[in-house]
């Protein structure tokens, strides 16, 4: 079984967006989550303690020659408990206006889910949100602006697989929190613009970061 989060074209509407699932090793695919022709999947996180539980973030966006649009009615957070066959929104406690989103469920505690959310920058409504009940409700734990400073291009969040209170955020810079997102320290690793992070599930000190 393979899942793909497809963001889709940036410059116009298309039906080729959302969450796709393959049951035959990639030979054929089914779109299991589609919102609208302007909203693609920006992230997918699987609960490794129960792989039928999936969390997906959808992002409505357009990059036009004269402006960039991030956010809209299509942006939102979704959960499936049956391997992607059915989805429902989980937005209790989140801002009404959502832009780009990233999500990560903790392998150390399946009830804890981290959500990095772009929202109205003028009102500073975005930041890092945490759910302690598997997405039923959310609370903002940090409004530190640098966590979403390059949200159009890349914002990522990664829960440490062995410690539910350690979480990493990648943006123009890389950050780590060891208190569940309340405070942050910068990670220095050569060039900035960090895009991805792998943490060894058997040894959290063994990591690979890419820019």
Predicted segments — roles?
Residues 1-211:
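Beta-propeller blade termini and top-face loops
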